[in-house]
Amino acid sequence: MTTEGGPPPAPLRRACSPVPGALQAALMSPPPAAAAAAAAAPETTSSSSSSSSASCASSSSSSNSASAPSAACKSAGGGGAGAGSGGAKKASSGLRRPEKPPYSYIALIVMAIQSSPSKRLTLSEIYQFLQARFPFFRGAYQGWKNSVRHNLSLNECFIKLPKGLGRPGKGHYWTIDPASEFMFEEGSFRRRPRGFRRKCQALKPMYHRVVSGLGFGASLLPQGFDFQAPPSAPLGCHSQGGYGGLDMMPAGYDAGAGAPSHAHPHHHHHHHVPHMSPNPGSTYMASCPVPAGPGGVGAAGGGGGGDYGPDSSSSPVPSSPAMASAIECHSPYTSPAAHWSSPGASPYLKQPPALTPSSNPAASAGLHSSMSSYSLEQSYLHQNAREDLSVGLPRYQHHSTPVCDRKDFVLNFNGISSFHPSASGSYYHHHHQSVCQDIKPCVM
């Protein structure tokens, strides 16, 4: 199959091999003309083979080029989709919720309720306050509302008030329990330590007893307790001495018998009556009626009960009847008729000049024992004014009379005092002008 003068057939295989240079030349060369088909056979075969190889190469190259854009498009599309999904994730992660306020839900609710003038809010009003105050509660997250309701209903420091008649709306008012005032520190809404509440619960009875006894809460005290009067006030049943100037004397008892810090009692064998210094720091006792006896008659005596008058040896207040209307102090426990039963008797005690403390030790001892100081802890830390208010133990006792015995202290106008032990608590009348009253723990 060899032709004379023709080239060997080996170059035909070499021409069909896809050489990059030949492929480029075939793509750039114009197509063969139709007149070249009448040429010699070897040339024709070689040209046809070359053209076929060129067409094969061109078809393969075109297919490759067509497949390349499709692959490029696919890769570009996939990359775009991946970039789009990554951008969506980044965009969603960039919209983070605002940070929660650094307070517990209890503190937030307390903050909302205390911002109200009436100190009470409905649930929707609490929501509105929190949304207006903190950006955390304005987002799409609504789980905080469940937390608010949970804390309102399960914490005992919040009280649900009954709905008032005629009030529009369906929500109940919520307020703070007054007993939970120690839950938060003053000036902030941070919780106190865990054991602080139990300590406050343990100290609460003592706190109320002290407040009610010392007169810090006027609504907790009986009507007989009187507060301290200003220095410009008229003379009355007030004691400005002792315990920081707080008035702790009930209006039915002699403040002069309390022996303020300005008084200087002399505790000798002569039993002198304590003399009170006439300085403005201590006021003096005027006519102060106390609860009357069974017959409507008050007791008489320098500290035993009844109308307590200023003694001539212990008070510079004159004993003139003209001063009766000016310095008389009425007690709510008595009526105006609970005075001396004798019409001619003066409502003020005046010690006769003949009766001196050294000449009559019995009378002066009775006066002195009644003028001894009251015990604050025994007398005025009790709520019951009639039952538990008692004259306490004196600081200096001059007699060995038992405190538990019930004595009827009788004092007539002549200054002679006598003691009648009574088992039935009856009342003795010494003369026309002497009256008495049962003194429960009478200390002499």
Swiss-Prot record:
Where is it predominantly found? nucleus
The alphabetized UniProt keywords are: Activator, DNA-binding, Nucleus, Transcription, Transcription regulation
Question: Which tissue types show expression of this protein?
Answer: Lung and placenta. Predominantly expressed in gastrointestinal tract including stomach.
Q: Does the keyword Transcription apply?
A: yes
Q: Which GO terms describe its cellular component?
A: chromatin; intracellular membrane-bounded organelle; nuclear body; nucleoplasm; nucleus; transcription regulator complex
One Gene Ontology term of the biological-process aspect is: positive regulation of DNA-templated transcription
Q: Give the disulfide map.
A: none
PROSITE patterns named among the record's database cross-references: FORK_HEAD_1, FORK_HEAD_2, FORK_HEAD_3
Gene3D superfamilies per the UniProt record, alphabetical: Winged helix-like DNA-binding domain superfamily/Winged helix DNA-binding domain
Q: Output the InterPro entries linked to this UniProt entry.
A: Fork_head_dom, Forkhead_box_regulator, TF_fork_head_CS_1, TF_fork_head_CS_2, WH-like_DNA-bd_sf, WH_DNA-bd_sf
Q: Where is the composition biased (Low complexity)?
A: 34-75, 309-323
Task: Report whether Transcription shows up as a keyword of the record.
Answer: yes
Subcellular location field: Nucleus
Question: Subunit structure, briefly?
Answer: Interacts with the transcription factors TBP and TFIIB.
Task: Report what the protein is called.
Answer: Forkhead box protein F2
State the organism named in the record: Homo sapiens (Human)
Q: What is the lineage of its organism?
A: Eukaryota, Metazoa, Chordata, Craniata, Vertebrata
